[in-house]
Regions:
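A conserved, well-ordered hydrophobic junction motif at loop->secondary-structure transitions
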Residues: 30-50
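Hydrophobic residues positioned within well-ordered beta-strands of beta-sheet architectures
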Residues: 25-27, 70, 86, 100-102, ...
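Short coil/loop residues immediately preceding or within conserved phosphate-binding loops
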Residues: 12, 69, 97-99
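Non-catalytic linker/capping segments at the edges of enzyme domains
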Residues: 1-35, 129-134
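Hydrophobic beta-strand-centered segment that forms part of the acyl-chain substrate-binding groove
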Residues: 54-90
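Hydrophobic residues in beta-strands and at strand termini
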Residues: 29-31, 74, 120
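HotDog/MaoC-like acyl-thioester-processing domains
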Residues: 64, 79-80, 89-134
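Alpha-helix C-terminal capping segments
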Residues: 13, 17-19, 52-61
Length: 134
């Protein structure tokens, strides 16, 4: 399957697609020193969230997909050097609204889980508005 969204994203910071399927995706991330939050090597949760968000976007794989909201839980700490795998599965679609479940694992241990609500607008969110009054 061809990648249709988030083509310019940094694989080093957000992960690299491992699997693209209709309604699902897997993204792998090796955590690096730039993600370190402290002297013990704790990885800032924003990088784990970014990985999960990217997997959700790829499960939908529409060019204009954006995140609307997320309900998630961090289940275990991640440290520099950990290899993470995010698995995303489309739960349902209602119009432009897509619900995606994402799990992030380090080997067999789950470190993050969440449900993402994404939207697919007809045009890119940064595209100039057309028509209307200026």
């Amino acid at each position: 399957m061809e990648l249709h969204t988030h083509r310019a994203i940094s694989a080093r910071l957000c992960g690299a697609p491992r699997l693209l399927a209709s309604g699902g995706a897997e993204v792998e991330l090796e955590t690096v020193d730039d993600m370190r939050a402290d002297e013990l090597g704790l990885v800032h949760g924003g990088f784990v969230f970014g990985l999960a968000d990217y997997a959700a976007m790829l499960a939908i794989n529409e060019p204009n997909v954006v995140l609307g909201s997320a309900e998630m839980r961090f289940l275990a700490p991640v440290v520099v050097g950990d290899r993470l795998l995010a698995t995303a599965r489309l739960l349902g679609v209602e119009g432009k609204r897509h619900r995606v479940e994402v799990h992030v694992n380090r080997s067999a241990e789950r470190v993050f889980e969440g449900t993402f609500v994404c939207f697919v607008p007809p045009a890119h969110v940064l595209a100039p508005a057309t028509g209307g009054v200026s």
